[in-house]
Amino acid sequence: HWKPLFLVAFTATFFPGFFFAFAVSQIDSSVSAILNSLTPLITMLIGFFFFGFSFSRRQVFGVFVGLVGTLLLIVKSAEINPHQHYEYALLIFLSSIGYAYSLNMIKTKLSDLDALSITVSCFAVLMLPALLVLVFSGFFNDLVWTSKASESLFYVSLLAIVGTAMAKVLFNRLVQIS
């Protein structure tokens, strides 16, 4: 299971985290959220073409309605904010592809593992790369160790561990039972 876990870890967590951070520095977060709503459509397309899934007409219609809404919101946003760097939207699109790919991988290749095992394994795979990014980003050099900074770091860490990890466990379980 390590190969699918490795792929799921990087496509669903590692790269999208950075892609979103870079993208929202250049485009509105609302645009990134709208673009991220393409994930169900991309999930269906990847599932159909690469994993052999079939879908009901109702499912396809629902995703199509969502796509039309997404396109309308993107066009309106571009009219309202024409001076943004919309080429960064490609990073959001790549994240959606990563999410879609990982959803299909969890459903097909990791369905025999429980959701907690998938989550723990993915975060274990990402520990070293994430630590390397943290070290080489200058985080430890730039951090001023005060009581407020330590407290803030504690709460961010708590949010990451409790919020993100628990959400990933629940999400992985929902993917498995869908």
Where do the model's predicted regions map?
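Hydrophobic alpha-helical transmembrane segments of multi-pass integral membrane proteins
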Residues: 7, 58-68, 87-91, 105-162
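Specific transmembrane alpha-helical segments of multi-pass solute transporters/efflux pumps
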Residues: 1-36, 72, 160-178
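Structural signature of hydrophobic alpha-helical transmembrane segments
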Residues: 22-40, 85-98, 151-161
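Membrane-interface helix caps of multi-pass small-molecule transporters
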Residues: 18, 22, 26, 45-54, ...
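Hydrophobic transmembrane alpha-helices of multi-pass small-molecule transport proteins
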Residues: 46, 55-77, 96, 130
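Hydrophobic alpha-helical transmembrane segments in multi-pass integral membrane proteins
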Residues: 15-22, 71-81, 126-142
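Residues that define the loop-to-transmembrane-helix transition and helix capping
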Residues: 3, 30, 56, 116-117
